Design a protein with these regions (language model features):
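Short, conserved turn/kink motifs that form compact alpha/beta structural patches or helix kinks used as
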Residues: 2, 30-118
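Active-site-proximal polar cores
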Residues: 1-33
């Protein structure tokens, strides 16, 4: 009898997820954006396959990283595609978020955010 693992080890690090909020001056002018963290998740970096590029709809460039995390119950009610992810000090946009058949794991397809010139 073969024992199935209870959970997969997600030990590549922790990612921070959240939203970008616009900061405004007292006059109401936009002065920039700041990342507001909603939480942290342990992740494992996954390899990208051709089917991942087709599913996301990005054929040549744009898909930088695919990560696997546990599926928190709080994620069932939010739009995961509008999230921003901060990993190792690098900000990423979530292109697509997909779950497995058991809704135990969540896969984030990430594109590195473009830095604005300051």
């Amino acid at each position: 009898m073969v024992l199935k693992s209870y959970r997969e080890t997600l030990n590549d690090g922790f990612l921070q997820y959240g939203y970008k909020k616009t900061e405004r001056s007292e006059e109401g002018k936009r002065i920039g954006e700041k990342f507001h963290e909603e939480g942290k998740l342990a992740y494992k970096v996954m390899s990208l396959r051709d089917s991942d590029y087709k599913m996301v709809g990005v054929l040549t460039t744009g898909l930088d990283v695919k990560v696997k995390t546990l599926y928190p119950p709080s994620f069932r009610k939010i739009n995961k595609n509008k999230l921003k992810v901060l990993m190792d000090g690098i900000e990423y946009d979530v292109i697509k978020a997909d779950h497995d058949s058991n809704k135990q794991y969540l896969f984030f397809y990430l594109q590195q955010a473009v830095k604005s010139r300051e």
